[in-house]
Regions:
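Non-catalytic, C-terminal membrane-associated alpha-helical segments of glycosyltransferases
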Residues: 247-310
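Short, acidic, metal-binding catalytic loop of nucleotide-sugar glycosyltransferases
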Residues: 22-31
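Glycine-rich, basic loop-to-helix element that forms the pyrophosphate-binding segment
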Residues: 61-78
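Short aromatic/hydrophobic "clamp" motif used to bind/position activated sugar donors
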Residues: 83
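A conserved acidic beta->alpha catalytic loop
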Residues: 23, 38-47, 63
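Acidic/His-rich active-site region of diverse nucleotide-sugar glycosyltransferases
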Residues: 91-176, 180
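Short beta-strand/loop segment that forms part of the nucleotide-sugar
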Residues: 32-40, 59-60
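A short, conserved alpha-helix in the catalytic core of glycosyltransferases
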Residues: 158, 163-166, 170-175, 180-208
């Protein structure tokens, strides 16, 4: 069996992390190495890990640098045949890792494989996510049909969140994630870069993880109106992704027609939810940076972004 490192990303979710690690350790295939990347938790996560999971290697970040930053920490240093990037809000099925590994190494051109995400929060029988992509015309989310035939084995995807098993050779060829994207769409950007090298990403529908986050979210949360940094990312990242991977005509259609509609919708919701002025300032900064990226291809560094919106 190929070797595997599991890298769990966490921030102030000690109890979720404990359940996640327990499910990994009690599976049919024990990972060769388990790492936890702690994004500056203040809830006693570090102490819990030292006490209850001494076999886990812990990396403590002094600030919350986002998912992509932690993913890059793991991608740049693992030495096994594969790497599972796992969020702390998963309770994996006992055979999930074993099934993913077998599938990943059954096909030379399969670079990434993911499990089916079930709604572990309140209805474990319900599928909450099984793949998708961003439309390069409109920027909207295109999600795979959750009512798939029982005999179907896989779904292709460009969205690779939450529990992503990556083959080492594909990771080495693709390089690191763009941490300037912070979280939203950074996974799709990475997957599309990998696809250009000839590697596919697929959901293995027989492998399962229970996603323990609440699926029903408020509109404010769904729109990123939770903090200025997330608002900035929502304003910017669609345009960045379409600029990088769409044709010129697709990008022009998006920027001249769809993007203004998105902006009007988000600005309306800022008024509706009475978002503070800092949110409006962040959103306008995202618009400016998306336009700047269209002409120059440049984006502010992760440290610059954090200084502006923290």
């Amino acid at each position: 069996m190929p070797t595997v490192t599991v890298a769990v990303i966490t921030h102030n979710r000690k109890e979720l992390l404990k359940s996640c690690l327990s499910s990994l350790i009690n599976g049919t295939l024990l990972p060769d190495e388990i790492r936890v990347y702690d994004n500056a938790s203040t809830d006693g996560t570090a102490e819990m890990l030292k006490c209850e999971f001494p076999q886990v290697k812990v990396f403590e970040n002094k600030e919350n640098f986002g998912l992509s930053y932690c993913h890059n920490q793991a991608l740049s240093s693992f030495t096994t045949d594969s790497l599972l990037l796992l969020d702390d809000d998963n309770i994996v099925a006992p055979d999930m890792l074993e099934k993913l590994l077998k599938k990943l190494f059954s096909d030379q051109k399969l670079g990434i494989v993911l499990p089916l995400f079930m709604n572990g929060y309140d209805d474990p029988k319900t599928v909450c996510f099984c793949g998708g992509e961003t439309s390069l015309w409109s920027g909207r989310n295109i999600l795979r049909d959750k009512n798939f035939p029982k005999e179907q084995e896989t779904y292709p995807t460009y969205r690779v969140p939450n529990a992503t098993l990556i083959k080492k050779e594909a990771a080495q060829a693709t390089g690191l994630m763009d941490d300037r994207l912070f979280s939203t769409m950074a996974d799709e950007d990475y997957c599309r870069r990998m696809a250009k090298l000839g590697y596919r990403a697929e959901f293995l529908l027989s492998a399962v993880t229970d996603h323990m986050q609440e699926v029903k979210r408020s509109d404010a949360r769904r729109l990123g109106l939770t903090n200025p940094l997330q608002t900035y990312i929502f304003a910017r990242n669609r345009a960045v992704l379409i600029k990088r991977y769409g044709m010129l005509f697709q990008f022009l259609v998006f920027m001249l027609f769809w993007q203004p509609l998105y902006h009007l919708y988000y600005l309306f919701n800022m008024l509706r939810y009475r978002a503070p002025g800092s949110f409006l300032k962040a959103y306008l900064a995202g618009i400016v940076d998306s336009i700047s990226h269209a002409f120059t291809g440049n984006l502010p560094s992760l440290s610059d972004i954090r200084q502006r919106f923290n």
